Amino acid sequence: MFYNQEGEEEGGLVYRCKAIPDGQDADVSLTFDQYRQDQNVYLHHEEHKDGRAQGVDDGLTIISRPDHTQTKEECALYAAMEKLPTEQRDKLQLKSLQEGKISTRRLFVGDRRGVTDGSAYDDAGVFIKNRWGRDAIKLYVDYQNKPHLEVYDQLGKSIVYELKLPK
């Protein structure tokens, strides 16, 4: 753990690993916290494997956090949102973001790979979200080594630019 001069945690080295039925769940990360807040920058390796899916994320993540939220309250809001229909969840999430009650993952630079429902994926790139947590820009190379540049409007509508490479 890292502590500031006031004795408050400011980040640290986090690691965990456990066997689960048909696989494992593990991660290790180097985290840096916002003042009196949870992590907002972390370098990480995360892996999950069970009988249905497997995946690995390696990269750098940046989270935009309000100055005054409480982690327990934020977790409770996310838990409540998961139980709502999509439209209601999206409205509550947007309202909570606007009111500074929850955080937003803004940037991921790294590699995501695995298999879900029999489909393989391996996307390495830069993934940027807007301040409301919606996709804004994705610049990545996919499983078949095909480069992608995807741009989204504020409502999340995709405007896709595909790079045509000579064969």
How would you label these PLM feature ranges?
Residues 1-167:
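Parallel beta-helix/beta-solenoid repeats that form elongated, surface-exposed shafts/blades used
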